[in-house]
C-alpha cells in the first residue's frame, strides 16, 4: 500500500493574511442555482503570492521567465524535509550538519510563522551565500514555511536573485508543522498562468519508502 498524501498548503479563505497592501483573498458565488437553474459558479480574487505559492523569476526580474515558461519537473519529485529550530537566518552554518547529497528539492521547516491568521512582522531569511552552496549539491528547488526567502523589508531581494542565478526555484508559504524530517515525494504544480509572476499551488508530500 502506498503512503497517503500529506497536504502542506495553506487554506484559502477570507482569513488568510496577505502582504501589506496586496490584494485580499475573496471568494463569492457569482451565479447561484436559483439564477442559473442548474449550477453554482464562484469567483475568486487573489494575489499570485497568497498562501502557498511559487515565485517565477519575473516576480523580481523584468526579463525573467513567467509562470507558463517554468519546467514542471522542478515541482514534482523527490524532496527532503529538514527542521531548523527557529533560526534567525538560514545559511551555510545552519545547514552544515544536514546531508544534502542527492537532494534536488529541499523543504525547510523553521517554525517561525506560528500564527498564520496574521502576517508576520519579521522572519528568518535565506542568507544569499547559501544559494551556491545548495547548487553544489544539485538542489533545484527550495521551499520554506515563510512568506518570503528575503527579509520582509528588503527591496533588493538578494536571496531571490542569488537563488535564481544558481538555478534554484522558490516555493513559499508551506505548512510543515505536521511533517517529520525525511524524504518524500513532492507535488506542487503552478497553474498555467501565461503572464504571471507567481502562482498559488496545492502542495502535497508522500513519504518515500
From Swiss-Prot:
Residues annotated for Zn(2+) 1 binding in this entry: 49, 53, 55, 172
Pathway: Amino-acid degradation; L-tryptophan degradation via kynurenine pathway; L-kynurenine from L-tryptophan: step 2/2
Required cofactor(s): Zn(2+)
Catalytic-site annotation from UniProt: 59 (proton donor/acceptor)
EC number assigned by the record: 3.5.1.9
Keyword field: Hydrolase, Metal-binding, Tryptophan catabolism, Zinc
InterPro entries, per the entry: KFase/CYL (IPR007325), KFase_sf (IPR037175), Kynurenine_formamidase_bac (IPR017484)
Cofactor binding, per record: Binds 2 zinc ions per subunit.
Binding residues annotated for substrate, in chain numbering: 19
Example of a GO MF term: arylformamidase activity
Reaction(s) the record says it catalyses: N-formyl-L-kynurenine + H2O = L-kynurenine + formate + H(+)
GO biological process terms, semicolon-separated: anthranilate metabolic process; L-tryptophan catabolic process to kynurenine
Residues that hold Zn(2+) 2 according to the record: 55, 160, 172
Assigned protein family: Belongs to the Cyclase 1 superfamily. KynB family.
Reported function: Catalyzes the hydrolysis of N-formyl-L-kynurenine to L-kynurenine, the second step in the kynurenine pathway of tryptophan degradation.
NCBIfam families named in the record: trp_arylform (TIGR03035)
SUBUNIT field: Homodimer.
Name this polypeptide is given: Kynurenine formamidase
Originating organism: Geobacillus thermodenitrificans (strain NG80-2)
